[in-house]
Amino acid sequence: MGFLEINWTSAAMLMLFVLMVYFLNKFLYTPFIEMAEKRRKKVEEDLKSAEQLKEEAEKMRSEAERFLSEARQRADEIVESARKEAEAIVEEAREKAKKEAQNIVESAKTQIEVEYKKALEQVQERAAELSVILATKLLQKVFQDERARREYLVKILKEEIEKS
């Protein structure tokens, strides 16, 4: 048998090897590669989805922080407004009380002045009465005579009328 003789056993083995590679490729390797590719794509999609969720979560967190900041700012503004309003109310009450106190003081001063004038008039009236009584008694002692007393009173009245 020569060098170029065909060994049918080796040819059959080669043929079986090629068939085995073909079937392994078709039924094992190709489905495995497809499954691995699908898994890779699924992992990539999951990673993209996770990244999107992370971005959305970050947006929501920043939006929540912004809302919280705005709420704090509004609360601070409300507190400041309430404080200013309270100060204004206190100041208004203070001014009102001050005006009322001034009115009371003015009223008291006016009342005191009226009472003082009344008292002064009463004192003057009483002094005039006492003066008349005193003058009458003095004149009675000085002028025992009724006629002399009348002449003296007429003289004084004439002088007073001339002065007026």
UniProtKB/Swiss-Prot annotation:
InterPro entries in alphabetical order: ATP_synth_B-like_membr_sf, ATP_synth_b/b'su_bac/chlpt, ATP_synth_F0_bsu_bac, ATP_synthase_B_chain
UniProt entry keywords in alphabetical sequence: ATP synthesis, Cell inner membrane, Cell membrane, CF(0), Hydrogen ion transport, Ion transport, Membrane, Transmembrane, Transmembrane helix, Transport
Annotated TM spans: 10-32
One Pfam family hit: ATP-synt_B
Bilayer topology term: Single-pass membrane protein
Subcellular location per the Swiss-Prot or TrEMBL entry: Cell inner membrane
Gene Ontology CC annotation, any one: plasma membrane
The organism's place on the tree of life at top rank: Bacteria
Cross-referenced SUPFAM superfamilies: F1F0 ATP synthase subunit B, membrane domain
Main localization (coarse): membrane
PANTHER family from the UniProt entry: ATP SYNTHASE SUBUNIT B, ATP SYNTHASE SUBUNIT B', CHLOROPLASTIC
Role: F(1)F(0) ATP synthase produces ATP from ADP in the presence of a proton or sodium gradient. F-type ATPases consist of two structural domains, F(1) containing the extramembraneous catalytic core and F(0) containing the membrane proton channel, linked together by a central stalk and a peripheral stalk. During catalysis, ATP synthesis in the catalytic domain of F(1) is coupled via a rotary mechanism of the central stalk subunits to proton translocation.
Sequence similarity: Belongs to the ATPase B chain family.
Family matches, as NCBIfam families: ATP_synt_b
Assembly mode: F-type ATPases have 2 components, F(1) - the catalytic core - and F(0) - the membrane proton channel. F(1) has five subunits: alpha(3), beta(3), gamma(1), delta(1), epsilon(1). F(0) has three main subunits: a(1), b(2) and c(10-14). The alpha and beta chains form an alternating ring which encloses part of the gamma chain. F(1) is attached to F(0) by a central stalk formed by the gamma and epsilon chains, while a peripheral stalk is formed by the delta and b chains.
Protein name, as recorded: ATP synthase subunit b
Source taxonomy: Bacteria, Thermotogati, Thermotogota, Thermotogae, Thermotogales
